[in-house]
Amino acid sequence: MEVAVARHALDRVPISLIIDDSTVLVNLNYFFMRDRNLADGLDRRWEDVPVVHPESFTREFAEFCLEHGVRGKYSVVPCPAALGRIDEGLPMFSRAQQESWLRMCRELIVAAFDITPEMITHTFVVDLDTFQPVEPRLWEQYDWEALPVEREELVRDYIAAACRILDNVGLPPEGVTSPGGFGGRTVEFYAKVVGPAVRGVTGNPTPYFFKGAAADGPVETPVWYADREAGTAVAQLMSSTGDWTGSWTGYGEVNPDRYVTADLGGGRIPALLDAGEPAILCSHWQGFYGMHNDDRRGFRALKTVVRRLRERDPRGERTRWRKCSEITNYACAREMAEVIVDGQTIHLDLPVRVPELTLRITGTRIRAASVGGQPLRRVTSRADFASGTFLTEGEATLAAFEPAKRRTTVELQA
């Protein structure tokens, strides 16, 4: 008999939506393009780009996601474009306007999405005492593409400061998002500092950082600095699609067919799902909103994609929308799990425990199964396969459950 932790919880391929560049009310990209044009001499279109993304739009987006089961990650940039800290108040808006947005985010966005900072400003590197740009000016996404590895404490404190601002407004982050190229040339070091930076604020044993994209081939979720004794690790989240919802400019390409075609067979997502690879969509908030409140080009494209994916798997037998932290926590649990088979008994040592832990068992026919003395219910269809059940398909049996203890025993009857 062979036993392994299944690659995906409930053996359903995860789908997740990454939203980058979002924050409290302001469109930070207006200021990024304005300021970056001065720095590099390029002529990005910026003057007619909206300065504000209304709370009403964000609320409508969140309600749609909750209604249709969409899950993922939503950035809240802590000090957007160095305009001010959101825990101290942005000078552009009243305290009441900002508190209203934050309350909406805590009630609606958090229900469907992880919250992460996208480092502190997504533009200038700031001094941690003043939160003003350092001189000479450095850019988070350009000058810190290679993080200053010789200043480990500074980088750790910088990431921790981003997390602390969010925690101060009741939005404890599950991990961090990289602004542009941030950390891309020093990924191992980046992973090293993310762990203590996030844990020092939230206590999360398995935070993640979003860095990188898989254009083709396998979609990995690397696990860094795993410590089985402490039950800690850092996961690296990677996207697996391009951004065809308006992109980072807010006026880029919009094409739902590039995700999934109307006949449900073409596009990037079906290719991923059919190969058992996570479909992790990367989009930008300014693209969802577009150029004005009646535009919503990216949001309209998302609605089409969500509808087509539901048509493709109407009973949710093969796929499941997930928060990014659900994907990364499961990857940590799977990577660190120890599985020992002794006859009809499976001994599990689980430094990281996650909901819906799923085992794949081959080489024997299972009549009954129990976890910690509690029987699992036998089901005969994928639609009914859930935590607390087991399902036999062909030569394999899947068993899913909620492990209550690090050392868990699964008893089988053949």
Q: Which ranges hold each PLM region?
A:
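Short, solvent-exposed loop/turn segments at secondary-structure junctions
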Residues: 21-24, 77-83, 120-124, 180-185, ...
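Well-ordered, non-membrane alpha-helical segments in soluble/globular domains
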Residues: 44-61, 91-103, 152-161, 188-196, ...
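Mature N-terminal, pre-catalytic/accessory segment of carbohydrate-active enzymes
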Residues: 1-14, 352, 405, 413-414
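C-terminal beta-sandwich/jelly-roll accessory domains of carbohydrate-active enzymes
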Residues: 324, 334-414
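Short, well-structured secondary-structure segments
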Residues: 14-16, 26-27, 34-142, 174-177, ...
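Surface-exposed cleft-lining segments at the edges of enzyme active sites
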Residues: 44-49, 88, 145-151, 248-257, ...
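Catalytic cores of secreted or luminal carbohydrate-active enzymes
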Residues: 272, 283-287, 292-336
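Active-site-adjacent pocket scaffolds in enzyme catalytic domains
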Residues: 1-9, 16, 22, 28, ...
